[in-house]
Amino acid sequence: MSVDLNHTIVHARDNRESAEFFVDLLGLEITSEWGPFIAVALNNGVTLDFATIPADRITPQHYAFLVSEEEFDAAYAKIGQRGIEHYADPHRKQPGAINYNDGGRGVYFMDPAGHAMELITVPYGGWTA
């Protein structure tokens, strides 16, 4: 059986602000807007469908994105240019740093809605042979 993720709804205080944050930071594009949703497409066809909801109803989630070394460099440069607080670890004990887990690089930061974001260049456990 083949099962693929098609889309996920990402709650935001402002769907446009959150969608544009991802578009700008990761070089993605808005592919559609309908109803309460602004969809941002990832390379594998999955969309992040941003929906505005009241801030007190947002439950922070964690989203991890596997990116190339070049994409990491570009995104990390933007994180630095914008003064976005970032950490090498999910518990925020190593501020202003990145990690080198599994032979790659990774960084954690928050999006405008308070979701914990992670960029990694190597999947957890490393690449399979």
Give the predicted meaning of each segment:
Residues 29-61, 67-69, 110, 117-121:
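Conserved short beta-strand elements that form part of the metal-binding/catalytic scaffold
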Residues 27-33, 84-87:
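Short secondary-structure junctions
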Residues 1-3, 58, 112:
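Structured loop/turn residues at beta-strand edges in well-structured enzyme cores
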Residues 65-112, 116, 124-127:
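Vicinal oxygen chelate
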Residues 1-16, 63, 123-129:
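N-terminal beta-strand motif that seeds the catalytic metal site of vicinal oxygen chelate
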Residues 16-29:
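Amphipathic alpha-helical segments
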Residues 5-7, 45, 60-62, 104:
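Short, solvent-exposed beta-strand edge segments and adjacent coil->beta transition regions
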Residues 22, 76, 121:
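Short, flexible helix/strand-to-coil boundary loops that buttress conserved ligand/catalytic motifs
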